[in-house]
């Protein structure tokens, strides 16, 4: 099944919406990706600065070795830090190491703990609205489905019905 995961916002909450059954050859998806990529490139160096303010001294080169396009994700920061021998005993990284409370999926957990809205290394990217993404997906033959609501809607599940009214078709 052709599909895509797209970042968007609803009521200032960043969400991930899956578009199942889309026409992935439609240029609208590439254009959206290019627009977001430009913003992500600009945010990557800010993320590096914010990460280093937590008591690290990561270098751009360490992240460039993990990134194919110059965008640094929270997962990449987690990977670079956990592999950096200087930080074997760093207190902030202990939960992500073997046997730690966040070690089941350390890179992704590092992302969720430090790089999403409200966390210390979050950098804002202006994403399209939920309504726009639902329309984009539907107009190109797809079905719009909300991804991992437990992470994005923590404590705000009351807005889910509104999102369905906007055209969301699944979870």
Predicted regions and their residues:
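Conserved acidic, metal-coordinating active-site core of Asp-based
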Residues: 71-145
């Amino acid at each position: 099944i052709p599909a895509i995961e797209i970042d968007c916002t609803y009521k200032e909450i960043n969400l991930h919406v899956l578009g199942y059954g889309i026409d992935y050859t439609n240029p609208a998806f590439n254009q959206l990706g290019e627009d977001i990529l430009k913003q992500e490139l600009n945010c990557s160096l800010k993320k590096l600065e914010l990460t280093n303010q937590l008591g690290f001294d990561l270098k751009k080169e360490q992240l460039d070795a993990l990134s194919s396009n110059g965008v640094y994700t929270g997962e990449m920061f987690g990977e670079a830090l956990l592999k950096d021998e200087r930080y074997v005993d760093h207190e902030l990284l202990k939960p992500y190491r073997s046997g730690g409370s966040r070690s089941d999926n350390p890179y992704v957990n590092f992302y969720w703990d430090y790089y999403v809205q409200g966390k210390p290394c979050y950098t804002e990217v202006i994403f399209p609205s939920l309504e726009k993404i639902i329309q984009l997906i539907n107009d190109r033959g797809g079905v719009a489905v909300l991804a991992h609501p437990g992470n994005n809607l923590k404590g705000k599940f009351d807005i889910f019905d509104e999102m369905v009214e906007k055209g969301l078709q699944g979870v």
